[in-house]
Amino acid sequence: MQPRRVARELALLGVNQLPATAAKLSEKQLEDLLLAAIRALQEETHETLSTAAAEIQRSDRLLHESDPLLLAASDAKEEGGARSLTVRLQQAQRHLQRLETALKEANAGDTVQGELLELAHQAQVALSNAGQALEHLEQRLYSVRRILDEVVQLSQKAVNRLGVALSMPELLHIAQAQEVRAYALQLLTALRTHKEAIDARLQGVLVGWQLKRVGRIERDILRLAVVEMEILRSSPDKVAINEAVELAKKYGDPEAAAFVNGVLRRLVDSRMEAPFGRNPSPAGDLRS
């Protein structure tokens, strides 16, 4: 796991805790923000594991609930009757064969109208019963499929959450490194110092949106990306955009990644028209 990626994540978690009014934060206050961000990651790990365990338990419960439906579907028996669906279909087929024979005899001129009507009625009843049985079977199978689909989805979610949780110990270990915390502090300090200019820059490339109406997570991700791309100039545009998109995938809603990607690419395209001031201070020697 890359140190700078962890630093970006810490900074994102710390942005939400920045005071709205303080003009300048002390280094101690910023350090406290990062410690709070690390604690948030630890809590997220426990929550992720708990959620995964709950999803696995629900999957197991659903599988047990599906057992009676599977048995009912395999039996495919009518309420109050012992004949299987196959027997009922065979019965209907025999009635139809008898009816066909009677019709042939009728064409020969020797027919009994009452017998024809009775055979037709019997065939109709048999087919109706078979149709109802098929409908009941289809309903049971649909219920089983729905349950199994939910089990698969829950299992997939649990696997994904476990994958995230397994990466957390490494992330938490790297987050304690001095170089990681130093870069996260650098991002937070630059964001706090240049917040108004950053917001104006972003508003200039938003199409049909007001920055204040953008979701908090997406807005903070965009701000940190501008810090890297146009204030610290510590990462190439492509790297900063890709990293911002990854943060949006992890912390934003399903549309967040595409939104962040589009805004930042428009920002790069507009740079020749509205260049941002270069910060003369070095960005450090961390590599993305």
From Swiss-Prot:
GO terms, biological process: DNA-templated transcription termination; transcription antitermination
GO cellular component: cytosol
Transmembrane intervals: none
Example GO molecular function: RNA binding
UniProt keyword Ion transport present: no
Family: Belongs to the NusB family.
Name of the featured protein: Transcription antitermination protein NusB
Underlying gene: nusB
